[in-house]
Amino acid sequence: MANGPNYKIKHRRRREGKTNYYKRYVYVISKQIRFIVRITNKYVIVQIAKIDPKGDIMVASAHSSELTKKFEWKGDENNTPSAYLTGYLAALRAVKKGVTECVADIGLHVPSKGNKVFYAIKGAIDAGLKIPIGDISIENDRIKGEHIAKYAEKLKSENLDLYNKLFSRYLGRGLNPENLPSHFEEILNKIKSSGG
């Protein structure tokens, strides 16, 4: 790291917006298992990790692309329902390996109302993990994607071209976005029956 008389350059991963070293230090000191949620522009990534001096040990993980490949999910891989399903899937795998409690590691995401990170955590809680998240309000209709279905219905009646443009991925995979809540239930049942 470069040092100057008035300025000290931060660590590379902090400059890149990848690691909050203060929070990481707190997690390492606590020695608790972390429930890590990362949202990218295309996917949701969930990992359950144990702290180890040599490096973190991944107990279980799930990637939202698995929903498409293994469970035939036809929606987007980075929306609210897929965040919930990815969290649920990762938690099922962790529970199988004997994990019962975790702490939420949301990284540099801002803990704001409606953030997809909390829907992934809610999925893990519903799968059987104990994760303290405080008094964050989570709307059950958003978990199923009812807000997406309502918007799609409204847009279809008002502007068909924009509807086809915004929901091209859904339509290309053979799903009408208005049917997303029922498709969500179907995929959730597949995940439950497979056991992760």
From Swiss-Prot:
Identify the GO cellular component terms for this protein: cytosolic large ribosomal subunit
Instruction: Give GO terms: molecular function aspect only.
Output: 5S rRNA binding; structural constituent of ribosome
What Gene3D superfamilies does the annotation carry?
A: 3.30.420.100
- What GO biological process terms are annotated to this protein in UniProt? ribosomal large subunit assembly; translation
Tell me which Pfam families the record gives: Ribosomal_L5e
Q: Which branch of life, at top level? A: Archaea
Keyword terms of this UniProt record: Ribonucleoprotein, Ribosomal protein, RNA-binding, rRNA-binding
Listed under subunit, the entry gives:
Part of the 50S ribosomal subunit. Contacts the 5S and 23S rRNAs.
Biological role = This is one of the proteins that bind and probably mediate the attachment of the 5S RNA into the large ribosomal subunit, where it forms part of the central protuberance.
Question: Family, per the entry?
Answer: Belongs to the universal ribosomal protein uL18 family.
What protein does this entry describe? Large ribosomal subunit protein uL18
**What's the source species for this entry?**
Saccharolobus islandicus (strain Y.N.15.51 / Yellowstone #2) (Sulfolobus islandicus)
